[in-house]
From Swiss-Prot:
It comes from the Bacteria. Pfam families: RNase_PH, RNase_PH_C. The gene is rph. Homohexameric ring arranged as a trimer of dimers. The keyword Iron-sulfur does not apply. Transmembrane segments: none annotated. Phosphorolytic 3'-5' exoribonuclease that plays an important role in tRNA 3'-end maturation. Removes nucleotide residues following the 3'-CCA terminus of tRNAs; can also add nucleotides to the ends of RNA molecules by using nucleoside diphosphates as substrates, but this may not be physiologically important. Probably plays a role in initiation of 16S rRNA degradation (leading to ribosome degradation) during starvation. This is Ribonuclease PH. The keyword tRNA processing applies. Belongs to the RNase PH family. It comes from Pseudomonas syringae pv. syringae (strain B728a). It catalyses: tRNA(n+1) + phosphate = tRNA(n) + a ribonucleoside 5'-diphosphate. The lineage of its organism: Bacteria, Pseudomonadati, Pseudomonadota, Gammaproteobacteria, Pseudomonadales. One of its GO terms (molecular function) is tRNA binding. GO terms for biological process: rRNA catabolic process; rRNA processing; tRNA processing. Keywords: Nucleotidyltransferase, RNA-binding, rRNA processing, Transferase, tRNA processing, tRNA-binding.
């Protein structure tokens, strides 16, 4: 089996995390997984949603979108259609769930964190790139809150979060699928993990024949290998 990109089966794409990419948001990152590029920002606002008022904890929510020409052909903006699509809603809920797992909300204070992930170029793995990049933007936003005199109850960041795709391509497990691989894969799996080694989410779909337990285990092992590298890239980015 030869991958279209020439990568080894267990090889990530070239990944770059550029911090402070925009000047207004408390945290901002340009994350690049090969040719997939996503701008991730985290904005801090005082107050929490009504369902959390008086409970002494903060909140995090996420939104996701793609520029019309992030793909090979122009897509109509969802705003001009008047509603978000099912895929968009699914992905932004995944991003929010994943990043909330990084935080102790009781230490966040009476604030809401708004995570915005905007895909400017898509070549597969946009949701996993969004989570991995937004995690770094979130860490930066927490530093800003602390500088402003917040986080009196301690650091709310419990652990780092990252995500990666794996799949069965031409009968073999591969790591970090690009668009060509994703569109032809027999199985596509998105995995979200913590830096402590726990799983937050495993989303898997067989596009053709069902995948077998041993194939699932092989894909998860590849994902764990990729996570080790992703967490190191996050740490290196935050150390700059």
């Amino acid at each position: 089996m030869k991958r279209p990109s020439g990568r080894a089966a267990d090889q990530l794409r070239s990944i770059r995390i550029t911090r402070n990419y925009t000047k207004h948001a408390e945290g901002s990152v340009l994350v690049e997984f090969g040719d997939t590029k996503v701008i991730c920002t985290v904005s801090v606002e005082n107050g929490v949603p009504r369902f959390l008022k008086g409970q002494g904890q903060g909140w995090l929510t996420a939104e996701y979108g793609m520029l019309p020409r992030a793909t090979g052909e122009r897509n109509q903006r969802e705003a001009s259609r008047g509603k978000q699509g099912g895929r968009t809603l699914e992905i932004q809920r995944l991003i929010g769930r994943s990043l909330r797992a990084a935080l102790d909300m009781s230490k966040l204070g009476d604030v809401t964190l708004y995570v915005d992930c905007d895909v400017i170029q898509a070549d597969g793995g946009t949701r996993t790139a969004s989570i991995t990049g937004a995690m770094v933007a979130l860490a930066d936003a927490l530093k800003v809150i602390k500088k402003r005199g917040g986080l009196k109850g301690g650091d709310p960041l419990k652990q780092m979060i990252a995500a990666v795709s794996v799949g069965m391509y031409q009968g073999e497990p591969v790591l970090d699928l690009d668009y060509l691989e994703d569109s032809a894969a027999e199985t596509d799996l998105n995995v979200v993990m913590t830096s402590a080694g726990g799983f937050i989410e495993v989303q898997g779909t067989a596009e053709g024949a069902p995948f077998q337990p041993e194939e699932l285990n092989a894909m998860l092992a590849l994902a764990q290998k990729g996570m080790t590298e992703l967490f190191e890239l996050q740490r290196a980015a935050l150390a700059d």
